[in-house]
Amino acid sequence: EPVFFEKLVIHLLETMGYSGKHGTAVVTSKSNDGGIDGIINQDPLGTSTVYVQAKRYHETNTIGRPAIQGFYGALAAVNADRGVFITTSSFSANAHEFAKNQGIVLIDGIKLTELMLEFGVGVEIAKTYKLFRIDNDYFEDEL
């Protein structure tokens, strides 16, 4: 479900602190999103805004430069200076090159998974393990 994925992505970015202490984060209306799936206002006045594109594709899919150019066009239409494109798949080298030059952050499926684990979004700890090491100082001192 694309809407669920968009909500997950926005929730992750909020959990990472992108909406700030008093900011807001919303998933845009699907029928009229103009190529932007989420908007994060990082402050109450909305002077610092991050626009988000979220695409849930098969992991073997590669997103190319044209998709990033389309997102860049959507950003330009709202006079945005920053955007994040998040996918469950990967990006081509040309997509990375274009995004870097336009100030667009790309997060692929591997990085998305790492961030979800790091910030505890959609996961829970099932079990923890103790890892022991030898305390050499203990054995060097006389009892």
Role assignments for model-derived ranges:
Residues 1-143:
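Mixed-charge (Asp/Glu-Lys/Arg
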